[in-house]
Amino acid sequence: MTDSKYFTTNKKGEIFELKAELNNEKKEKRKEAVKKVIAAMTVGKDVSSLFPDVVNCMQTDNLELKKLVYLYLMNYAKSQPDMAIMAVNSFVKDCEDPNPLIRALAVRTMGCIRVDKITEYLCEPLRKCLKDEDPYVRKTAAVCVAKLHDINAQMVEDQGFLDSLRDLIADSNPMVVANAVAALSEISESHPNSNLLDLNPQNINKLLTALNECTEWGQIFILDCLSNYNPKDDREAQSICERVTPRLSHANSAVVLSAVKVLMKFLELLPKDSDYYNMLLKKLAPPLVTLLSGEPEVQYVALRNINLIVQKRPEILKQEIKVFFVKYNDPIYVKLEKLDIMIRLASQANIAQVLAELKEYATEVDVDFVRKAVRAIGRCAIKVEQSAERCVSTLLDLIQTKVNYVVQEAIVVIRDIFRKYPNKYESIIATLCENLDSLDEPDARAAMIWIVGEYAERIDNADELLESFLEGFHDESTQVQLTLLTAIVKLFLKKPSETQELVQQVLSLATQDSDNPDLRDRGYIYWRLLSTDPVTAKEVVLSEKPLISEETDLIEPTLLDELICHIGSLASVYHKPPNAFVEGSHGIHRKHLPIHHGSTDAGDSPVGTTTATNLEQPQVIPSQGDLLGDLLNLDLGPPVNVPQVSSMQMGAVDLLGGGLDSLVGQSFIPSSVPATFAPSPTPAVVSSGLNDLFELSTGIGMAPGGYVAPKAVWLPAVKAKGLEISGTFTHRQGHIYMEMNFTNKALQHMTDFAIQFNKNSFGVIPSTPLAIHTPLMPNQSIDVSLPLNTLGPVMKMEPLNNLQVAVKNNIDVFYFSCLIPLNVLFVEDGKMERQVFLATWKDIPNENELQFQIKECHLNADTVSSKLQNNNVYTIAKRNVEGQDMLYQSLKLTNGIWILAELRIQPGNPNYTLSLKCRAPEVSQYIYQVYDSILKN
């Protein structure tokens, strides 16, 4: 009889009987009792009260019974840690058993018992097992180290287990090597900068030797490890590729994908014009095609990975498009993936076959698949210009079928074709207008309205058509309302005499009867534009539109490179990096493809190899000396009266009596400051409705929404003989200002004010003298706006944005430090070209990339982008990947340091992920603080 009998009992109150059986003298009875306990545990019954009795059964030579007891222990040790200690002696004894199976079983079980009290007893047995004579024990112990590290990382390092793991890479048994690699890889995932694996040519050679002899899962561990290695040159990369290539013919699809991952990464390092490179591309195609003959689930995973490969290197599968033709019995999820890849591989050579297939798919019964097929025809027209006419003809044939969802999808697609090829296929508009009554989906209605508005001059009854949509204006979706508003304004600009009443009607509906702020705002913009300057309105609304791109759903190149490094993992199926869906993975080191420095192949990068290096090199910040000591020991001369200065003649004015100038060996404030940094005179602010509405409420010349840190007390009165200074920094009209408030809390008046800065990280100095021309009487305050520039001497401070200031008056000299918020150092020309951004991101070393969490932020991507742009942080590109908004941004500091940023925003998640890359990574922490401040204010 099988063991299933243990699961069929319905007895009540059997714990007492089991307890008696567990203490029976006969071995067979005890084994039967333990099986019953395990069965009860499996179906969810609480048998924890039998813990001492089950532990007593550990003292046996029967391997089956021992396994059952260990299984029980693993399940209940966490809930009964004090009782689990009882089993420690038995574990230690089993680790020295003559039978290697029992030794391995004992160390594996101890690793699975996640109880801190037990881990300290595990160290000695584990150390012995790592050096055990039997390879089965050694490979089990290797995995145990990773489990122990997860429980107590510090103890693993202190006990030297990581060194023992590294030694196992040179083990004679390939499975021991594979498990050691797996354990080290797992540990290094959570410690990305630890370099635990120490991958060098010698170790790589050992791994490649073991690769041929270990099991399939061992091969996967080794291949994944190889994919993290960066060969020193293309010769080494080719050597590794030659030894990995045989794995492409393996029966296990996971091994094949891991091998593909290694080869895809190392292809980056091979010369594009070499014979081996082209041969390797040809070798990659057959195994990928073979994966599509497996089960549907395997096919889907393979297709998701192939989608990435085709985006990176379409030439690999360009001759294999037929394997992606849909079969009638494919599940819908496989069909949709195949369709996507077909479009990516479509070219002038195969477009006839592809269109014939797509037309057939459009007659299927599955609505989602049909919609995607119709959309695919439009994508073909946009991608392959020579096929556009044939695609339009195919779409017209589909419209004639009068199948509602086919017609609606076709109209959406035709709108995009009109955008791509303006003034070419407008003859079909009449056919489209025949189907107006059947359109009930927002996308289709919006597309049709756009077409009517765009080509209103060619449609005789355009006003009647748009008026028919206007009848149910408030019942339409926002998308349709916005499109209709714009279309009627276009119609008015083309036929003003005939449509004046219509445009007034839609503007009234949008501005007075609508609760939607987007619609209302657009309505007001059009209304003001039309009423003030119709000529400008025409130029704005009827301006030439940019052509739409061929591929609108391509993955961003930097993300694509990262996903290529994760082929065969869940990230490649989700098309998201691991930190987007694995909880607590924000510290994981992000992977990137290597850069082949020996090639100037423009196909690899959208710009030449010199693009990134042509950027302005950041100023090197020298190390900080012992500045504070010198600053506090200034030999101050007699006070100097500061005249009212209208020009910039500053060379003769030594603000602090010569001490600070002698410290730095030159005047802090240059004798002549370029006009670029000359402060603009600040006009008096006269309150008026329009001024307040548009600009002056945010400060003269400051971008609306520009962040200004709240004023802080820099120098308390108790430390400055009654003088209190509070302040902040601002950035206005391209200039930096130090906004200060001086308060006299002493009993005597204060005069003869002067200010000077110490050397600092960004060379910040005053552009003009401190302009306090009247005595500061007791209990009086005065606001001072001091213009600054960054032409002064540079010395690295700690922290980096620290500014040491000396202020003099008729009483004494006072010293204080304040922190410059880095956003005031962001310059206006910090917007990179898109291609330069991509090349620079790749060129900056991966170790310079730092990742931060911006928590509790509830803004959408557009608001975030707008807020940051007001502070000279420019959004280069915005993508939506699987519902996640990704903003790619650049900014530039006054000293020429560029910072590149990737901001990930998941709608509904208040925590954003910010990745920063720059050539001076010590700046990143301060940039993150600025991002956090801007977005939370």
Swiss-Prot record:
The modification Phosphotyrosine is found at Y737, Y928. It comes from the Eukaryota. InterPro entries: AP_beta, AP_complex_bsu_1_2_4, ARM-like, ARM-type_fold, Armadillo, B-adaptin_app_sub_C, Clathrin/coatomer_adapt-like_N, Clathrin_a/b/g-adaptin_app_Ig. The modification N-acetylthreonine is found at T2. It holds the Pfam family Adaptin_N. The keyword Cell membrane applies. It is found in: Cell membrane; Membrane, Coated pit. One of its GO terms (biological process) is ventricular septum development. Keywords: Acetylation, Cell membrane, Coated pit, Endocytosis, Membrane, Phosphoprotein, Protein transport, Transport. Changing R879E: Strongly reduces interaction with EPN1. Reduces interaction with SNAP91 and clathrin. No effect on EPS15 binding. Phosphorylation at Tyr-737 by SRC occurs at the plasma membrane in clathrin-coated vesicles (CCVs). Residues 841-937 are annotated as: Interaction with ARRB1. The modification N6-acetyllysine is found at K265. GO terms for cellular component: AP-2 adaptor complex; clathrin adaptor complex; clathrin-coated endocytic vesicle; clathrin-coated endocytic vesicle membrane; cytoplasmic side of plasma membrane; cytosol; endocytic vesicle membrane; endolysosome membrane. Coiled coil: none annotated. Changing R879A: No effect on interaction with ARRB1. The modification Phosphoserine is found at S4. Changing Y815A: Strongly reduces interaction with SNAP91, EPS15, AMPH and BIN1 and clathrin heavy chain. Component of the adaptor protein complex 2 (AP-2). Adaptor protein complexes function in protein transport via transport vesicles in different membrane traffic pathways. Adaptor protein complexes are vesicle coat components and appear to be involved in cargo selection and vesicle formation. AP-2 is involved in clathrin-dependent endocytosis in which cargo proteins are incorporated into vesicles surrounded by clathrin (clathrin-coated vesicles, CCVs) which are destined for fusion with the early endosome. Belongs to the adaptor complexes large subunit family. Adaptor protein complex 2 (AP-2) is a heterotetramer composed of two large adaptins (alpha-type subunit AP2A1 or AP2A2 and beta-type subunit AP2B1), a medium adaptin (mu-type subunit AP2M1) and a small adaptin (sigma-type subunit AP2S1). Interacts with EPN1. Interacts with EPS15; clathrin competes with EPS15. Interacts with SNAP91; clathrin competes with SNAP91. Interacts with CLTC; clathrin competes with EPS15, SNAP91 and PIP5K1C. Interacts with LDLRAP1. Interacts with AMPH and BIN1. Interacts with ARF6 (GDP-bound). This is AP-2 complex subunit beta. It comes from Homo sapiens (Human). The gene is AP2B1.
